[in-house]
A protein has these predicted regions:
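A short, Trp-centered hydrophobic/proline-enriched beta-strand micro-motif
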Residues: 2-6
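ATP-dependent adenylate-handling active sites, centered on carboxylate activation for C-N bond formation
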Residues: 10-17, 23-33, 97, 110-347, ...
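N-terminal segments that mediate ammonia production and transfer
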Residues: 7-120
Length: 360
């Protein structure tokens, strides 16, 4: 994972790149006049690093709100700060300083070409790759820890890593506390498990600080436990691994698969009839079964806008004032990603979309 910028003094050019999944952020702000009459560009891993620059114009990007209402985070290259952009994952940029001309190119993309191998061979190959990646993070002579929820993904990483410590958080409410699983695995590995129970007051009390560190609006509440995990870990270690991203890679989300009811409905009802029903309900007020008929009628391009969906794009248009409805809606934005995988199966299309949006 990386985000870096290199200054080529001989060619008077700037080169910047971001890792393939966008784990590390990289923001930039092109300027027609950097203060000396010549063009320039600000860049950094946080937008707040631009705020004190005298020629940085502080203004809200009204176009950013429309897709945010559906996806619950800033998922476009444009940020909520007017004129500030995110370099997309797996992209690099070059800037010719004398002219200010910027060029952005993609250097990597997912490959869904089928490769026929025995299942056991896939398992062995995957295990080898994961162990190699985990081991690469242990090169530095520092303590390494892992975030451990007790679920499959983080447990696998912890078992491969054998960290110095594991960190877990739970909620001070019986039905939302799974730290006992993390403690059980840590004991089996012979590793100390550091735990914290988050109270309701602590949960809501952290939101303002979280928003400050995120630079942009973020309404996915998983950021709260991650905030406390990072806070605990930073007091004791400098490197932490987690199981983030595994659901997108290995189709772990429940919405990647049709429910038994959907499979039965698709088997009994012809596609033409399902599409007619799907088109009909799009013009009707919401009712129980509305989403069911929509999902059974069409391919993902017609309804799937990512696993973090809050408001349907049509609902967003009903609540936004005219000044804020000029940006792309989520469906339009996602369509650009679907165009990259036109011949893939429905599952791969959903995965490609989520992998493309996971850290943009």
């Amino acid at each position: 994972m990386y985000a870096f910028v290199i200054w080529d003094k001989k060619k008077n050019k700037l080169f910047g790149a971001r890792d393939i999944f966008g784990i590390k952020p990289l923001y930039y702000y092109p300027m027609a006049d950097a203060g000396d009459g010549a063009p320039g560009v600000l860049f950094g891993s946080e937008i707040k690093s631009f705020l004190d620059y005298p020629h940085f114009h502080k203004a809200v990007n009204k176009k950013a709100l429309r897709p945010y209402m559906t996806l619950q985070y800033s998922a476009t290259e444009e940020t909520f700060f007017e004129g500030v952009y995110k370099l997309p994952p797996a992209h690099y940029f070059t800037v010719d300083i004398p002219t200010g001309k910027m060029n952005i190119e993609r250097y990597w993309d997912c490959d869904y070409s089928a490769v026929e191998k025995p299942f056991e061979e896939y398992v062995d190959e995957l295990d080898e790759v994961v162990h190699e990646s985990v081991e690469a993070h242990r090169i530095a002579d520092v303590k390494v820890a892992s975030f451990l929820s007790g679920g499959v993904d983080s447990s696998y990483i912890a078992a491969c890593l054998m960290p110095d410590k594991t960190f877990s958080v739970g909620f001070d409410y019986t039905n939302f506390n799974e730290t006992n699983y993390a403690k059980e695995l840590s004991d089996k590995l012979g590793v100390e498990n550091v735990r914290k129970m988050i109270t309701a007051d602590e949960f809501f009390g952290a939101l303002e600080d979280i928003q400050y560190h995120m630079d942009e609006p973020q309404s996915n509440l998983s950021s709260v436990p991650l905030y406390y995990l990072a806070q605990m870990a930073s007091e004791e270690v400098t490197v932490v691994l987690s199981g983030e991203g595994a659901d997108e890679l290995f189709a772990g989300y429940e919405w990647y698969e049709d429910t038994p009811e959907m499979r039965s409905f698709k088997k009994r009802v012809p596609l033409g009839v399902r599409r007619a029903l799907g088109s009909l309900v799009q013009h009707l007020p919401y009712f129980k079964g509305h989403n069911f008929l929509t999902k059974c009628a069409e391919v993902p391009e017609r309804w799937y806008v990512g696993q973090a969906k809050v408001f349907d794009p049509s609902e967003v248009d009903k609540v936004l004032k005219p000044a804020y409805d000029t940006g792309k809606n989520a469906a339009e934005m996602c369509a650009e990603y679907y165009k990259q995988v036109p011949n893939c199966c429905e599952l791969s299309k959903k995965q490609y979309l989520d992998l493309s949006l996971i850290h943009i």
